[in-house]
């Protein structure tokens, strides 16, 4: 953080100039998954950043690849003979978590719906209330996307979203279902 200031009741924070988002890099690379060693390093940094937030009683609530930026998105280009195309490999996987516009302190009002749909935890979809674990769910979805190159839960419908979760993870716990009634 370089500086911060208040602008008509809005806290503004200035940071260093960053590179592309991890999503934009993935998209520009034809959704070619990141190599596992890069996934591991990016996942570690995201977990460390979120741990810092949670230790300070703050939930990000909108973690997604678009809100994770490379410090520098320079890349090396190589030609894949098998796929007959150029592929990019980011030179440095140093990242920063950004966009704290919907971040919420533990003691503040928690709106019913948070997170971008594809990274939304089941307790948010079921409107059971949420806290810091919703960030952890989002991290899991992000790591999957980095590793395979596509979104785990590609949907825009609550019921379909929950059905997709059940297909992958098994039935939603009955204690959660009971609380929705």
Annotate each predicted stretch with a short phrase:
Residues 1-181:
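Intrinsically disordered, low-complexity regulatory segments of kinases
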